[in-house]
Curated annotation (Swiss-Prot):
<dbReference type="GO" id="GO:0009507">
    <property type="term" value="C:chloroplast"/>
</dbReference>
<dbReference type="GO" id="GO:0004497">
    <property type="term" value="F:monooxygenase activity"/>
</dbReference>
<keyword id="KW-0150">Chloroplast</keyword>
<feature type="site" description="Transition state stabilizer">
    <location>
        <position position="337"/>
    </location>
</feature>
<feature type="binding site" description="in homodimeric partner">
    <location>
        <position position="127"/>
    </location>
    <ligand>
        <name>substrate</name>
    </ligand>
</feature>
<feature type="binding site">
    <location>
        <position position="330"/>
    </location>
    <ligand>
        <name>substrate</name>
    </ligand>
</feature>
<keyword id="KW-0456">Lyase</keyword>
<dbReference type="InterPro" id="IPR000685">
    <property type="entry name" value="RuBisCO_lsu_C"/>
</dbReference>
<dbReference type="Pfam" id="PF02788">
    <property type="entry name" value="RuBisCO_large_N"/>
</dbReference>
<dbReference type="GO" id="GO:0016984">
    <property type="term" value="F:ribulose-bisphosphate carboxylase activity"/>
</dbReference>
<keyword id="KW-0460">Magnesium</keyword>
<dbReference type="GO" id="GO:0000287">
    <property type="term" value="F:magnesium ion binding"/>
</dbReference>
<dbReference type="InterPro" id="IPR020878">
    <property type="entry name" value="RuBisCo_large_chain_AS"/>
</dbReference>
<dbReference type="Pfam" id="PF00016">
    <property type="entry name" value="RuBisCO_large"/>
</dbReference>
<feature type="binding site">
    <location>
        <position position="181"/>
    </location>
    <ligand>
        <name>substrate</name>
    </ligand>
</feature>
<feature type="binding site">
    <location>
        <position position="298"/>
    </location>
    <ligand>
        <name>substrate</name>
    </ligand>
</feature>
<dbReference type="InterPro" id="IPR017443">
    <property type="entry name" value="RuBisCO_lsu_fd_N"/>
</dbReference>
Length: 490
């Protein structure tokens, strides 16, 4: 008896039987998989729904973030499906957690368009985060292979070139955010910039939500800021700047503001993370072509980065932003008012500043990674810091960082210039003592260094007296899984 055409051509494999079969049996789980150098690796923190096997949950994440849908489709056979399927290859229980797992997943590099964060993220953090079989999902870390990294430009300027332009080495840079962030006129805004820079800061900056509101349009702000910068540079003989926020409703307007900032003499522009990945990459290309520093405010990141069980760990955002080409990114303070476990913050800073990453589980770094000659990105510490914490800031954050004292400059009782001077004197005293071998992080030694410096600097003494009891000792919501962290300010 002759067979029908459909019977003769049917694939004799359970994998391609019509209907719904488990993701693990569809090829998205392979415990024996040998990771390739060209694979993009992702580590997810998975909380399966009750009754869902963690291996099946990991396979589901692999499938739904690559080639799978909810049922078998015969068009898989028209592709190199075995190659293109993401492979979950390892599942480990999370230490000190119940029914939560780390899932390691490998993706074929050809699944992603070159130099496109939007395409990369459309798969890795796309529909899969709403998958019903998983009650919570967090992207903890990624390894981007050398071959894919080389398609991205990375920071246009980087740490070394920025220091060359400022002629400033061996010390953190000093900045401040103009306060109040909203409501000032252009003239008063420019005055804040001038006073802060003349008092000793390297930079002033716009805050995340100052764009072009009725009380001060962007062009007015830019012109008054540049007047303050030029006057302060002439008075001090130092290179100065102010981060001009060019974030706008459309890319056409962003480019318009960027071109104007360049035309009037600014050397740096600023954008917000909420602009989106395509917009960030686009203006980063412009910054490289126009020899401008690009500062990124991480506005909005805590909506998905702060909670430990769901979202995206900020270390992944750091990797993506370094790839995209920003020169600065806010990355935490440890001791300030914003979320910041010391070990986690050190991990973020390592990702931004090192050329090669080693596995460091206490810091939350799960993969080795070579940055493929992409330049280093300058971390920015901002949010609730003051000069009395200088020994802690230098200890935790090192030299390659911009320390931004907004309220800690502009809130000084004797005025903005006095606040800037207090920060400059505190920084220089602490760096000098450190270089002389002092145990500056010691709870007695560090504060004494500041008190000694304040004997010849009235503004510093005033600042220390005002903020001596201010600290933000709250337990972080995002802490290391493989080490315990002491309270940051102890």
């Amino acid at each position: 008896m002759s067979q029908s055409v459909s019977e003769r051509t049917r694939i004799k494999s359970d994998r391609y039987e019509s209907g719904v079969i488990p993701y693990a049996k569809m090829g998205y789980w392979d415990a024996a998989y040998s990771v390739k150098d060209t694979d993009i690796l992702a580590l997810f923190r998975i909380t399966p729904q009750p009754g869902v096997d963690p291996v099946e949950a990991a396979a589901a994440v692999a499938g739904e973030s690559s080639t799978a849908t909810w049922t078998v489709v015969w068009t898989d056979l028209l592709t190199a499906c075995e190659r293109y399927r993401a492979k979950a290859y390892r599942v480990d229980p999370v230490p000190n957690a119940t029914d939560v797992y780390f899932a390691f997943i490998a993706y074929e590099c050809d699944l992603f368009e070159e130099a496109s964060l939007s395409n990369l993220t459309a798969s890795i953090i796309g529909n899969v985060f709403g998958f019903k079989a998983i009650s919570a999902l967090r992207l903890e870390d990624m390894r981007i292979p050398h071959s894919y990294l080389k398609t991205f430009q990375g920071p246009a300027t980087g740490i070394i070139v920025e220091r060359e332009r400022l002629n400033k080495y061996g010390t953190p840079l000093l900045g401040a955010t103009v306060k109040p962030k909203l409501g000032l006129s252009g003239k008063n805004y420019g005055r804040v910039v001038y006073e802060g820079l003349k008092g000793g800061l390297d930079f002033l900056k716009d805050d995340e939500n100052i764009n072009s509101q009725p009380f001060m349009r962007w062009r007015e702000r830019f012109l008054n800021c540049l007047e303050g910068i030029n006057r302060a540079s002439a008075a001090t003989g130092e290179v100065k700047g102010s981060y001009l926020n060019i974030t706008a409703a459309t890319m056409e307007e962003v480019y318009k503001r960027a071109e104007y900032a360049k035309a009037i003499g600014s050397v740096v522009v600023m954008i917000d993370l909420v602009m989106g990945y395509t917009a960030i990459q686009s203006i980063a290309y412009w910054a490289r072509e126009n020899d401008m520093l690009l500062h990124l405010h991480r506005a909005g990141n805590s909506t998905y980065a702060r909670q430990k069980n769901h979202g995206i760990n900020f270390r992944v955002i750091c990797k993506w932003m370094r790839m995209s080409g920003v020169d600065h990114i806010h990355a935490g303070t440890v001791v300030g008012k914003l979320e910041g476990d010391p070990l986690m913050i050190k991990g973020f800073y390592d990702i931004l500043r090192l050329t090669e990453l080693e596995v460091n589980l206490p810091f939350g770094i799960f993969f080795e990674m070579d940055w493929a000659s992409l330049r280093r990105c300058m971390p920015v510490a901002s949010g609730g810091i003051h000069c009395g914490q200088m020994h802690q800031l230098i200890h935790y954050l090192g030299d390659d960082v911009v320390l931004q004292f907004g309220g800690g400059t502009i809130g000084h009782p004797d005025g903005i210039q006095a606040g800037a001077t207090a920060n400059r004197v505190a920084l220089e005293a602490m760096v000098f003592s450190r270089n002389e071998g002092a145990d500056y992080f010691n709870n007695q030694v560090g504060p004494q260094i500041l008190r000694d410096a304040a004997k010849t600097c009235g503004p510093l003494q005033t600042a220390l007296d005002l903020w001596k009891d201010i600290s933000f000792n709250y337990t972080s919501t995002d802490t290391a899984d493989f080490a315990e962290t002491a309270t940051a300010n102890r």
